[in-house]
């Protein structure tokens, strides 16, 4: 199920039922560009609506970039828990690299009141695999219990995710929206914070990447977009995804 809404997020969210959303995943405006739509949403009214619609154990996952991220965190320090860092494959401020560090990172801030769904998406490890062979050296011999644990250990070649996420942009789709995020990154977040058939809200959905990820992963989706152009793109993309499933 998907429900796509054209309109102002703060107004349209008032029509969403209390405690009906399993997770919020959104790339909200940072106020760092000259685009007409890149105006920071008033944060306190935003939090009022998000707290009302999210389930008690739902995660609110919001993209950002400094200095906006610091403002976002500070607006709800009580619920802020941690950040992910999306590391891009190329600089976004190449004209400034002689004056300041190159920008390759955007933040993804996670907020919640109670422990939400968390499904760790294991990352393929490219380094040397761990061995179950342990050499007894100067530190002394292993106990029988330790030896048993070592013998039972098998390296699968995968690791739990760390805060740094490396995803390349979707080159063929990157012109759909100025702040387009990789589909694989959104799939990672959707799988991490929701289970199948749950409902995800993106209240600034842009060209609909979160919605596409939800449809591919058998999640329900509710999206709100202010700009007609991007709403139409999102509607088309999500519709095409439905046809491909």
Per-range role (PLM):
Residues 239-245:
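Generic C-terminal helix-cap and adjacent flexible tail
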Residues 1-223, 229-231:
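Core catalytic lobe of class I
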Residues 234-235:
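Conserved SAM-binding loop
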